[in-house]
Amino acid sequence: MKATKMRNRQIYQASTRTRSMQVGSPLSKELRAKYGKRSVRVVEGDTVSVVRGEYKDIDGKVSHVDTESGSVAIEGIKKEKGKGDKFDVLIRASKVVVTGLNASDSWRMKKLGGTAEPAAKADSEDAASVGKAEPEDSGIDDATEPEQAGAAGAESHDAEAPREESK
């Protein structure tokens, strides 16, 4: 099979979990600096800004996420049918930028917040440890270990030697 057929098969016959992961959008520069992540899975209630296509520069809240097509419906973006009825326009998740997060899901917010803080803590610890020249004592005396290992090896060698002589 050709590579394009294999790629299309992976995309269009993907599992529900894989499709859900494909509905991701990049974060705005402010959110990227705050959370330390580049992209996030879009959920209902997130505030997004369209960056490509006919509806470029329109902001709104996500009203519906369609994992089957990898698209999102945004409040305020609708089209009109011939009879006058209005329907939501689906926009690809990759064509929007997340400008505000729906904070109602505590697990999601904890997972997002967990990446930015340790990096900041690690930088402060590195700065504090630059002045230290002496490594911390681990409580194990390295000098005694080789001697003990050599003594144990010598004992076992001595124990084997008399056996050879007695034969």
From Swiss-Prot:
Biased composition (Basic and acidic residues): 155-167
Ranges of compositional bias, category Polar residues: 10-25
Gene3D superfamilies the UniProt entry points to: 2.30.30.30
GO cellular component terms attached to this protein's record: large ribosomal subunit
Keywords: Ribonucleoprotein, Ribosomal protein, RNA-binding, rRNA-binding
Family: Belongs to the universal ribosomal protein uL24 family.
Organism: Cenarchaeum symbiosum (strain A)
GO biological process: translation
Cited function: One of two assembly initiator proteins, it binds directly to the 5'-end of the 23S rRNA, where it nucleates assembly of the 50S subunit.
MF (Gene Ontology): rRNA binding; structural constituent of ribosome
PANTHER family associated with the record: 60S RIBOSOMAL PROTEIN L26 FAMILY MEMBER
Extent of Acidic residues compositional bias: 136-145
The protein's name in its UniProt record: Large ribosomal subunit protein uL24
Coiled-coil regions listed: none
Entries under Pfam families matching the protein: Ribosomal_L26
UniProt-annotated stretches for the region Disordered: 1-27, 107-167
SUBUNIT field: Part of the 50S ribosomal subunit.
